[in-house]
């Protein structure tokens, strides 16, 4: 009897299970959508938002991390919340949903004075900042507030700092050189439009002046704008840069002819601000590219601080660290930002990123992840700076992915390699010269050394932004003039001209004019 009851019960359960699975499959067949028809954008749009602002209250404050509890709808990840009842504006960015209607957020400013029970309001969107020509000549922080004490930024245009990279169909596949007007860069390590350049340089080798000249030349040669994002840099350095830009004419306080927008998240800011300020700068640059069709220069100083801040945020959120203590999402964080820096059919963003290498270890995960995205490297050498040759770019260490005859042309490529060969041969001969002297060299070697010294001096160039310091007018040299000048040196057409004539001049005609002036003074 027991077995009969068991069989009857089992049959009933099986019948019920069959009926349930049938109804579930019918329901699923109505609502299921093939994965191929769902884009990333439609996924992002699915977050449930309400028309009225959703408010919650703070339930925990742990350093830069703030937990906020809501009664009804939760704000989506990356939404901005604003803390009420504070004199200074405090924005929180949603990072995690914890359960029990609580979200974990990262503060974009100091959390001193926050208490449990304080009210927070969901803004309904990610952090939004002012964009457009009105930002030129101004300094803003990570949440778009002006911090230069010159009043509010007069624009209604705003953009969210989180955006997707351009679609494949929107990207431009043409490899174009961005002519900077700086001889050593254009000849030996040219920048690609929409490329990413790593700028390696210690203190006092002319990094700031090179950055200012690039901003100035791109504005004059291409009519383009620049954006400078100071990520975790010293407040003093940011202040110095601002005043140097005013002195150099890159920023004008009198009219609207400024060529650069500044976005600062200094070293004393909380990690949330430092981790997001690069995205704020990138958003300002994206507006000029996408809405005005500009070729924009984006400077990030220092890209290592972006990674470092991401590591701090990751630890505060309780994620298990990866190699050397970095965040497990290191490659994703870097890739998400770097993929937005590209050339589209409308315009381009070319990024110059200063890179700090911890303990000079290039295998450290932070610089190693950055290198994967770089198209060119510009190395500033202290040894060259000590010789008084500015810009102090190392012509042998600097490199570019587009230094290829198919991109730059056969003539440019062969002249650049010829210049590097002469400089490398001269470097090899320096040991012999140090021990035995110039007299012991063969005639060919003497000629190589003579031409190398002329090339070294011809690689120097007076900058327009440094006119107020040097007293000599700056020079912007076209690509054609640069190639012609170095070709005439390596072919021996300038062997009769004195070395001093090649120092701090523009094109090869300036060399000849300077040589004539020197000859007249001596006669």
From Swiss-Prot:
PROSITE patterns: ATPASE_ALPHA_BETA. It comes from the Eukaryota. InterPro entries: AAA+_ATPase, ATP-synt_VA_C, ATP_synth_F1_bsu, ATPase_a/bsu_AS, ATPase_alpha/beta_chains, ATPase_F1/V1/A1_a/bsu_N, ATPase_F1/V1/A1_a/bsu_N_sf, ATPase_F1/V1/A1_a/bsu_nucl-bd. GO terms for cellular component: mitochondrial inner membrane; proton-transporting ATP synthase complex. It catalyses: ATP + H2O + 4 H(+)(in) = ADP + phosphate + 5 H(+)(out). Residues 1-19 form a transit peptide. ATP binds at residues 201-208. Its EC number is 7.1.2.2. Keywords: ATP synthesis, ATP-binding, CF(1), Hydrogen ion transport, Ion transport, Membrane, Mitochondrion, Mitochondrion inner membrane, Nucleotide-binding, Transit peptide, Translocase, Transport. GO terms for molecular function: ATP binding; ATP hydrolysis activity; proton-transporting ATP synthase activity, rotational mechanism. SMART domains: AAA. It is found in: Mitochondrion; Mitochondrion inner membrane. Its main location: mitochondrion. Belongs to the ATPase alpha/beta chains family. NCBIfam families: atpD. F-type ATPases have 2 components, CF(1) - the catalytic core - and CF(0) - the membrane proton channel. CF(1) has five subunits: alpha(3), beta(3), gamma(1), delta(1), epsilon(1). CF(0) has three main subunits: a, b and c. This is ATP synthase subunit beta, mitochondrial.
